[in-house]
């Protein structure tokens, strides 16, 4: 018995030893599992997913699988480097686990494929949170030609149909929500960002819990093992909705989301893992590359075709397709779970793997090529009729990620260079038709999708209409980025925390634009040279001959030197003088020259009405100035419907030569409104005033018609005088028609025409000749009709029936007086006529410098007087009522037959003129220069008497006889000037005269109204005969009453002429009824608008002048 019981303690000891060994082995295995290498996991965005985390996976015999990932994070790369230093034994002892390919699709589902079992689907789970993308931004009615396309990672892109380019918007969904709740006056933004975490069984796909802002929900199941590995999915969804603030109706919306994956081994929940291990998906600069040690063992590559919705596995060495899986929904993200690590799969790796070793020397180049393809890819796809974008990591890095992109600080702006993606779409396969092998399932997916390609055509781009096109790759070319860089200015918060996210502007290469740059520089040089030459280097003016005159009012034509042409606008601007005329008025155009000044049309800057501004240069003597001012004050008080209204007057004393320089600048700037019309030197007639008996009182006018020969001329001689004095002979005037060759014999060159254009001169026509082409006007006109000139087309029809130019020069230049007296002047005239063939030249009326025309009067000016310093010039500006350019002279020239002139209308016009003259006489004034060219029409066709340059008081003292530079032998009244053809005999003879001189002029105007002329020669002859009371028989027979009245008005004796009141009450006007006759005499100032808006058309009221 003792022997039998002895071995029992030994058996117990052996049993204890066996149990201890088993426990030791179990502890060692447990310790090994705890010492296995691990790494943290961070979440990525879409295709750019997170780095890996290591965990123990049950050892399963499987082939080596690897994924080329150009977008893995650097942290994981560092881990691989550390692991590469491990011993080979440690590498062999590492446990191998199952390989799963986790796929996230746009419909919100998660699927797992078994990489070792030919891609068989391990599990498929719908978490019930809806699709990842939903938007109404692609509809054309939202943004028109431009639209906003969201990206799955939260970036926004703007598509421009016109430019066919896509640009990144400088803010994300988060910054759009955080910047302001109000997007515009009619849009309010609402929405937010939601984070949801899902816990899944790694290999069964069963949902264990869901955690969100509302709390966590768990599914307890006995089937779930405690040690089963967990896949941690985190879904980020961002939603923005735009609603109307009043109605609450939704205008547009979009929502984008993405999944992030992490692998949790065993039961370790690691409290606080979100703070310690999760990284922002926006950190896109990390990447992971498999170490060289592992690359020696791998032989399979997992690739994702975004366009075909496929996941494929290739043999790395042979490039053979091992397996593929077709999804029915676009793929958003993909991961490979192997050996306890999560490796993101690039969706944009389009590298071809082939067995050809010559193409790429080693496997390292393959990785670099895959990385290059990944960098420059953007995919534009469509899901359920909604466009969306998937961008690679390298392209996404170039997009701004500031959350406060729309906010501003201190009004400062920051410039962000945004990448522009050109519309150069690349289809995903060389052939637009799908490959036959394996395409049946894909066709089935298309047929089952209710959002077919007919629905896709409703999208904004209308590009995905081919049945097998689901999207396009948009390469991001570096050379295009270097050529052009789109810059969008946005405002940022001045925070140093964000300074590291700003990318510097890429260098712009200008070599591609060398032609445009060269052309722009050349154009700038030419334009600058032209402007400088025109403004600062004007052409030198031609100087006027000393013996030459052109209706000059002021002594403006002094010696003109080349230095004057160098004066620029800067000299005038810096002179310090401010003109009231230029301050209060805006000049429009020059309307012409009156008896004493220049008339401008100008617009008042305050009331916006147009007025006629007359500029008169006052005489140098104080007595003369007082007289002119007294006359202006008297005229300003005249208020009558038949008189041009005066509104305002002021004096200006500009610096020396300031006004001349301003006039020259006006000429250059307003050249279209200042053309000159003149007879051609070949066609210009000559007007010869022959020397007659100085004691003869008979007026003689001889008209010689121009001959067709080259040198043709006609002469008009007007000789008049007084029996009491031989010094009163009328000034002779001679014009000679010569060619341009005769002009070369002249001693002096012709003066610049432009310089004379703004001279205050005494011309017979005070208005611009409206019938001449280009609104031209005459510098030294006659009574020749502008209508006739335009009708005949030549200047040979111009007739100078008076010597207005002579008088104009005489009345304005006192130095001429010494040369106009007695026989001295007759002797000078004789010498002039003997040498006329040598020294005569044509009037400078043409703008052509090669055919000058000069008005030759052999009046020598004293050089000493010319060099004497002149006193400051004083100008009187008078603001008057603006009338039409057409005066009574133009009105009659357009009606050359009696049928064209209605008798009633002519009498109506004359009656209005007579009433205006009667009003003047009642105020103790006389006009002294009544003629058709001084009778105007307002915009509403009311007759107005104007041009009161020669108006004077009827009781003027004799000592004031020369205050306005009278002619040499005339001893009464201002200047003794006026148009000779309409002057009374006492004016021409230089005798004392009264207001009856206006009655004489009225008689000639009435005769000319009732008796039209076909030619100007006929007009000159007939009016000359009528002045001597020789009336045409037709006029006597047809108008007997008018004949008697005209005969009385033209009586040689002023005492026998009727008063203006008697004329108005004549029986001729009592037998006829005029439209508005009674209204005319009671017409107030309001019936004729004082100022008129800028309009050249007559009013629509009743016009007493038919055919105007």
Swiss-Prot record:
UniProt biased composition (Low complexity): 837-856
**Name under which the protein is recorded:** Eukaryotic translation initiation factor 2-alpha kinase 3
* SMART domains noted in UniProt: S_TKc (SM00220)
Keyword set includes NAD: no
Per the record, what are the reactions this protein catalyses? L-seryl-[protein] + ATP = O-phospho-L-seryl-[protein] + ADP + H(+); L-threonyl-[protein] + ATP = O-phospho-L-threonyl-[protein] + ADP + H(+); L-tyrosyl-[protein] + ATP = O-phospho-L-tyrosyl-[protein] + ADP + H(+)
Gene symbol of the encoding locus: Eif2ak3
Write down the PANTHER family for this protein, in alphabetical order.
EUKARYOTIC TRANSLATION INITIATION FACTOR 2-ALPHA KINASE 3 (PTHR11042:SF166), EUKARYOTIC TRANSLATION INITIATION FACTOR 2-ALPHA KINASE EIF2-ALPHA KINASE -RELATED (PTHR11042)
- Indicate the quaternary assembly: Forms dimers with HSPA5/BIP in resting cells. Homotetramerizes in response to endoplasmic reticulum (ER) stress, leading to its activation. Interacts with HSP90B1/GRP94. Interacts with DNAJC3; inhibiting EIF2AK3/PERK activity. Interacts with ATAD3A; ATAD3A and EIF2S1/eIF-2-alpha occupy a common binding site within the cytoplasmic loop of EIF2AK3/PERK, leading to prevent EIF2AK3/PERK association with its substrate EIF2S1/eIF-2-alpha. Interacts with MFN2. Interacts with TMEM33. Interacts with PDIA6. Interacts with LACC1.
- Active-site residues (renumbered): 929 (proton acceptor)
């Amino acid at each position: 018995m003792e022997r039998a019981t002895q071995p029992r303690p030994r058996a117990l000891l052996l049993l204890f030893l066996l149990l201890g060994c088993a426990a030791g082995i179990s502890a060692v295995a447990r310790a090994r599992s705890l010492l296995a290498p691990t790494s943290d996991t961070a979440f990525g965005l879409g295709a750019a997913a997170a780095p890996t985390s290591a965990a123990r996976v049950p050892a399963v015999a499987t082939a080596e699988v690897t994924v080329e990932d150009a977008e893995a994070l650097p942290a994981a790369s560092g881990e691989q480097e550390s692991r590469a230093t491990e011993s080979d034994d440690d590498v062999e002892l590492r446990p191998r686990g199952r390989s799963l390919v986790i796929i996230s699709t746009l419909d919100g589902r998660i699927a797992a494929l078994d990489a070792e079992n030919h891609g068989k689907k391990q599990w498929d789970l719908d978490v019930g949170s809806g699709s990842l993308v939903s938007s109404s931004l692609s509809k054309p009615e939202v943004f028109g030609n431009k639209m906003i396309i969201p990206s799955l990672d939260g970036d926004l892109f703007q598509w421009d149909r016109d430019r066919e380019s896509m640009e990144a918007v400088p803010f994300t969904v988060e910054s759009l929500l955080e910047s302001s709740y109000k997007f515009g006056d009619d849009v309010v933004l609402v929405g937010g960002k939601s984070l949801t975490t899902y816990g899944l069984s790694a290999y069964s796909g069963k949902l264990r819990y869901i955690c969100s802002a509302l709390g966590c929900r768990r599914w307890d199941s006995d089937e779930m093992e405690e040690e089963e590995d967990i896949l941690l999915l985190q879904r980020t969804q961002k939603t923005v909705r735009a609603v109307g603030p009043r109605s609450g109706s939704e205008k547009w919306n979009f929502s984008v989301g993405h999944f992030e994956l992490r692998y949790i081994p065993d039961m370790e929940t690691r409290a606080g893992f979100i703070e310690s291990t999760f990284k922002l998906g926006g950190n896109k600069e990390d990447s992971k590359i498999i170490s060289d040690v592992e690359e020696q063992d791998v032989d399979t590559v997992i690739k994702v075709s975004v366009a075909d919705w496929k996941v494929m596995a290739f043999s790395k060495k042979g490039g053979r397709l091992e397996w593929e899986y077709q999804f029915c929904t676009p793929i958003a993200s993909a991961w490979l779970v192997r050996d306890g690590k999560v490796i993101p799969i690039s969706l944009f790796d389009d590298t071809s793997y082939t067995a050809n070793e010559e193409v790429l020397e080693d496997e390292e180049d393959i990785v670099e090529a895959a990385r290059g393809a990944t960098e420059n890819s953007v995919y534009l796809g469509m899901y359920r009729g909604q466009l969306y974008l998937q961008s690679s990591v390298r392209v996404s890095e170039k997009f701004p990620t500031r959350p406060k992109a729309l906010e501003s600080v201190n009004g400062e702006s920051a410039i962000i260079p945004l990448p522009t993606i050109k519309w150069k779409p690349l289809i995903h396969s060389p052939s637009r038709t799908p490959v036959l092998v394996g395409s049946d399932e894909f066709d089935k997916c298309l047929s089952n999708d209710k959002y077919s390609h007919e629905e896709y055509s409703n999208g904004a781009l209308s590009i995905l209409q081919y049945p097998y096109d689901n999207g396009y790759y948009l390469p991001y070319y570096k050379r295009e980025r270097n050529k052009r860089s789109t810059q969008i200015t946005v405002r940022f918060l001045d925070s140093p925390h964000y300074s590291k996210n700003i990318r510097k502007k890429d260098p712009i290469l200008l070599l591609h634009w060398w032609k445009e740059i060269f052309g722009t520089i050349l154009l700038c040089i030419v334009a600058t040279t032209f402007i400088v030459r025109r403004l600062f280097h004007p052409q030198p003016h031609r100087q006027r001959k000393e013996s030459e005159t052109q209706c000059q009012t002021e002594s403006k034509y002094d010696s003109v030197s080349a230095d004057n042409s160098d004066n620029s606008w800067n000299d005038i601007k810096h002179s310090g003088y401010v003109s009231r005329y230029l301050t209060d008025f805006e000049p429009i155009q020059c309307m012409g020259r009156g008896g004493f000044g220049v008339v401008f049309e100008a617009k008042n800057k305050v009331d916006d009405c147009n007025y006629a501004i007359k500029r008169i240069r006052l005489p140098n003597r104080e007595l003369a100035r007082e007289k002119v001012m007294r006359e202006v004050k008297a005229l300003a008080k005249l208020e009558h419907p038949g008189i041009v209204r005066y509104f305002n007057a002021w004096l200006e004393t500009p610096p020396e030569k300031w006004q001349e320089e301003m006039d020259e600048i006006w000429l250059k700037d307003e050249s279209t409104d200042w053309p000159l019309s003149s007879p051609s030197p070949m066609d210009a007639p000559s007007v010869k005033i022959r020397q007659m008996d100085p004691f003869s009182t008979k007026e003689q006018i001889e008209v010689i018609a121009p001959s067709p020969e080259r040198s043709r001329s006609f002469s008009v001689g007007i000789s008049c005088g007084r029996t009491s004095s031989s010094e009163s002979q009328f000034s002779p005037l001679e014009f000679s028609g010569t060619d341009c060759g005769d002009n070369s014999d002249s001693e002096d060159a012709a003066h610049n025409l432009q310089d004379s254009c703004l001279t205050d001169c005494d011309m017979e026509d005070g208005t611009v000749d409206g019938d001449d082409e280009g609104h031209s006007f005459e510098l030294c006109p006659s009574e020749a009709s502008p209508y006739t000139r335009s009708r005949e087309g030549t200047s040979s029809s111009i007739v100078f029936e008076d010597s207005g130019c002579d008088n104009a020069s005489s009345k304005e230049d006192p130095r001429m007086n010494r040369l106009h007296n007695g026989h001295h002047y007759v002797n000078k005239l004789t010498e002039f006529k003997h040498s006329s063939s040598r020294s005569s030249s044509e009037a400078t009326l043409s703008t052509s410098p090669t055919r000058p025309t000069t008005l030759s009067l052999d009046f020598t000016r004293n050089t000493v007087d010319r060099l004497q310093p002149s006193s400051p010039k004083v100008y009187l500006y008078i603001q008057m009522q603006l009338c039409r350019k057409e005066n009574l002279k133009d009105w009659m020239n357009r009606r050359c037959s009696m049928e064209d002139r209605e008798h009633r209308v002519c009498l109506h016009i004359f009656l209005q003129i007579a009433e205006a003259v009667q009003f003047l006489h009642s105020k103790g004034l006389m006009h002294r220069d009544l003629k058709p060219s001084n009778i105007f029409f307002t915009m509403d066709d009311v007759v107005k008497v104007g041009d009161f340059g020669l108006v004077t008081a009827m009781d003027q003292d004799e000592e004031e006889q020369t205050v306005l530079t009278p002619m040499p032998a005339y001893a009464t009244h201002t200047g003794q000037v006026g148009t000779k053809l309409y002057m009374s005999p006492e004016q021409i003879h230089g005798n004392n005269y009264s207001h009856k001189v206006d009655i004489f002029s009225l008689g000639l105007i009435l005769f000319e109204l009732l008796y039209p002329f076909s030619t100007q020669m006929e007009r000159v002859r007939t009016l000359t005969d009528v002045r001597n009371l020789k009336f045409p028989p037709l006029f006597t027979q047809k108008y007997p009453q008018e004949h008697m009245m005209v005969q009385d008005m033209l009586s040689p004796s002023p005492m026998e002429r009727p008063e203006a009141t008697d004329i108005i009450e004549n029986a001729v006007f009592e037998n006829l009824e005029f439209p508005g006759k009674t209204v005319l005499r009671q017409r107030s100032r309001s019936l004729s608008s004082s100022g008129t808006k800028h309009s050249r058309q007559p009013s629509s009221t009743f016009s007493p002048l038919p055919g105007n």
